[in-house]
Regions:
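Alpha-helical transmembrane segments and their immediate juxtamembrane cytosolic regions
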Residues: 1-354
């Protein structure tokens, strides 16, 4: 029996919701835990979990982009129409990212420097990724060709990241332009807490390649097998990257595993692919769609809850004193944020239906 379109898309919303929860816990513990609590095992695992929300959001943006593109192609839209539609949406997200920076700058007065207006954040890079993917789809027409091109671009971005952060830095560019390449911002070296094109766009293009695979005729007819294949491939990719990283030789003059390594990119991508397969199985056979699913609900309003929660965790209206709480206190705050964002999401959905 074939799954309905709603069932097919639920696991993508569920994955976005999971990314939201991982984002909440990362931000809450990072903002609120005291210096002594930051030495706890909880904080260590929280930071490790914090390496996945951005890859998930970008990867899922790539899949959604492929779904939209495939829908337009099935409607026999021209290549030019597809490019205009997708690039326009990417530009809208990029503009929202700029607006978000303006909001944070104004709410951060009198302490926030004007340079924060030009900080490269996750919304900026999602918008840029979508515009770049739109341009790629104009050059590579056809599903198979587009999938191969997207996978190739993801690989090239991952491989080019280490030198663009170190030995091949485009230092002649103004800092606000170089920051989109390697996240240097106003500092002497690239900053790992920013979201430049290298390496972050690679996750979006990887998602685009996966999305085109999932929209193929074979994958539509054998969806469970297709997701299982992706999950197994992801596990194999992560294992292979771990093996490569253990080798003593390196092709890069400067090697930074946690921030620029192609191996770390491949490990995270492999885990994300396995999570995608797991999310699909959970929504199809598990409790993911037994009645109301908080993760699916959050996933459908991920932009809204991202936008709102930041100010109540990191901003002027933080519900707890920053860097002053025990693990228990910060965990209670996390529960409050999760509940509030879920209620906000439900309220937004109800208003949309009226």
């Amino acid at each position: 029996m074939a799954e309905s379109p709603k069932q097919r898309l639920a696991y993508i919303d569920w994955m976005r919701g999971l990314a939201c929860v991982l984002m909440f816990q990362t931000h809450c513990y990072d903002s609120w835990l005291s210096d002594s609590a930051r030495h706890s095992t909880l904080f260590h695992w929280s930071q490790l979990g914090g390496t996945f929300p951005a890859p998930l959001f970008l990867f899922l943006a790539g899949i959604s982009f492929a779904l939209v593109t495939d829908k337009l192609r099935r409607r026999e839209s021209t290549a030019t129409e597809i490019v205009k539609t997708t690039i326009r949406r990417g530009a809208e997200i990029f503009a929202l990212g700029l607006l978000f920076r303006v909001q944070e700058f104004l709410l951060g007065q009198p302490w926030a420097p004007w340079t924060d207006l030009l900080r490269v954040d996750v919304l900026n890079i999602i918008g840029i990724s979508m515009m770049l993917m739109g341009g790629m789809c104009r050059l590579a027409t056809g599903r198979a060709r587009s999938a191969l091109a997207a996978a190739g671009i993801a690989l090239l971005i991952a491989l080019a990241t280490p030198p663009l952060w170190t030995t091949w830095r485009p230092g002649l560019l103004p800092w606000f332009l170089e920051s989109y390449i390697n996240g240097v911002h106003t500092f002497a070296a690239p900053q790992p807490w920013l979201f430049p094109i290298f390496p972050w766009c690679a996750f979006a293009f990887a998602g685009l390649a996966v999305g085109f695979f999932l929209t193929s005729d074979w994958a539509r007819q054998h969806e469970t097998a297709a997701l299982g294949l992706l999950g197994a491939g992801g596990a194999a990719l992560a294992a292979a990257a771990l093996c490569l990283d253990s080798l003593p030789a390196s092709v890069y003059a400067v090697y930074d595993f946690w921030h620029t390594s192609p191996n770390f990119f491949a490990i995270r991508l492999g885990i994300v692919l396995a999570m995608l397969a797991g999310g699909y199985a959970w929504c199809l056979w598990g409790a993911g769609e037994w009645g109301f699913s908080p993760l699916v609900q959050l996933g459908r309003t991920s932009l809204l809850v991202y936008w709102v929660h930041i100010e109540f965790v990191y901003g002027r209206f933080s519900i707890l004193t920053k860097r002053a709480n025990s693990t228990v206190g910060a965990s209670v705050g996390l529960l409050v944020i999760f509940t509030a964002m879920l209620l906000l999401s439900l309220g937004h959905t109800r208003l949309q239906r009226k």
